[in-house]
Amino acid sequence: MRVNWEEKTEKLVNWLREKTREANASGLLVGLSGGVDSAVVATLIKKAFPEKSLGIIMPCFSNPEDEEDARMIANHLNLKYIVVNLDEPYQALVSSLKNATPHEPEKLALANIKPRLRMTTLYYWAANLNYLVAGTGNRTELEIGYFTKWGDGGVDLLPIGNLTKTEVWEFARYLGLPEKIITKAPSAGLWEGQTDEGEMGFTYKDIDHYLLTGEGSAELVDFVKRMQRKSQHKKRIPEVPML
């Protein structure tokens, strides 16, 4: 079924304005990674608040091309942006943690520090400007829990949280975003050479097809269900015991 992207854009922009007003906030900001999800969200917040929207680029031992792409997106949208380099804070924290750890730290435990430092940075600016933080998670990532708890999952609003990754690509084309950004291999930038699909072992297209139709290989179905089970804790507020 053909999607009416003009209608969806208007609905999302109005929703962003409404939620921002409800929070008595002044505007919106987003972390710009150089990827398609953040590019789409940046477009939406710019449309919602042309003068009170901000992109924040936060390299952290990242691929330099990602920062270039993030700047390109901001310039393409005429979106105000700032760059906060997190190399030194990350290095200092990792050094302290390694010194206190009696064994070799888990790779993912160290990698997840990056999105958590970015979350802290976003909320620093949000508090200073009275803005809300717009997250970049899409439906596919949310369904399988492919995000860092209290990292990229730590946001106020998820404007594309009801769109699969495949739909985000289609939306990006409708919005006229640079083709380089749309065709770029999705990556969380957790370590050098990391890609989402390489880490998962499945393509977003196949995962989306299963999420929308219930059809997929036995291996894919097992992967999705396993990820959903493992990530339930990410989607809940902290539990409180009944006394």
From Swiss-Prot:
Gene3D superfamilies: HUPs. ATP binds at residues 31-38, 136, 165, 187. It holds the Pfam family NAD_synthase. It catalyses: deamido-NAD(+) + NH4(+) + ATP = AMP + diphosphate + NAD(+) + H(+). It comes from the Bacteria. GO terms for molecular function: ATP binding; glutaminase activity; metal ion binding; NAD+ synthase (glutamine-hydrolyzing) activity; NAD+ synthase activity. One of its GO terms (biological process) is NAD biosynthetic process. InterPro entries: NAD/GMP_synthase, NAD_synthase, NH(3)-dep_NAD(+)_synth, Rossmann-like_a/b/a_fold. Catalyzes the ATP-dependent amidation of deamido-NAD to form NAD. Uses ammonia as a nitrogen source. This is NH(3)-dependent NAD(+) synthetase. The gene is nadE.
